[in-house]
Amino acid sequence: MINNKVNVSLSKDLRKKYGIRRFPVAKGDIVKIISGSRKGEGGKVVDVDHKTMKVSIEGVTISKADGKQVPFFIDHSNISITKLDLSRNDRYERLREIAARKNLPPPEVPEETSNDTKESDENVTGADKEETNEIKEEDLNDNEDKNNDGSQEA
């Protein structure tokens, strides 16, 4: 039988923050290798093999005899999570439950903002915003005049 959870130890900062030592690893978490031949390397989790309890990390590869680069899977006991990906609601809720049980403050709500809105807000300066507001007001006044003209004829 395969256990669905591959628990990985948390970094010291996250242990203090969340009040737990281990948490299931998932795609998107940032991890660091703490022992083995690749000690010190780290990156974003790309894949979790639940059968062998090993984790593939972005940028950690091994070259085959023919020169191809393939993912290097690391045992879950040799890594620690340095940043949790809380974009999935079930993981965030689990941390909230743990915090409530241990009388700790709830974790911060994960930021779910799209890059499109950030870029559009950054490209518009204060002067541009004022100009667009003036244009909108003029359009509203023109529309009101048209509505008033049309109502007098009818």
Swiss-Prot record:
Coiled-coil segments:
none
Q: Which UniProt keywords apply?
A: Ribonucleoprotein, Ribosomal protein, RNA-binding, rRNA-binding
Which CDD domains does the protein's record reference? KOW_RPL26
Q: What are the GO cellular component annotations? A: large ribosomal subunit
Q: Which InterPro entries match?
A: KOW, Rib_uL2_dom2, Ribosomal_uL24_CS, Ribosomal_uL24_euk/arc, Ribosomal_uL24_KOW, Translation_prot_SH3-like_sf
Report if keyword Ribonucleoprotein is assigned: yes
Hey, what's the signal peptide range on this chain? none
**Which SMART domains does this chain map to?**
KOW
According to its UniProt entry, the function of this protein is described as: One of two assembly initiator proteins, it binds directly to the 5'-end of the 23S rRNA, where it nucleates assembly of the 50S subunit.
Instruction: Spell out the protein name for this chain.
Output: Large ribosomal subunit protein uL24
**Organism field:** Picrophilus torridus (strain ATCC 700027 / DSM 9790 / JCM 10055 / NBRC 100828 / KAW 2/3)
Q: Which gene encodes it?
A: rpl24
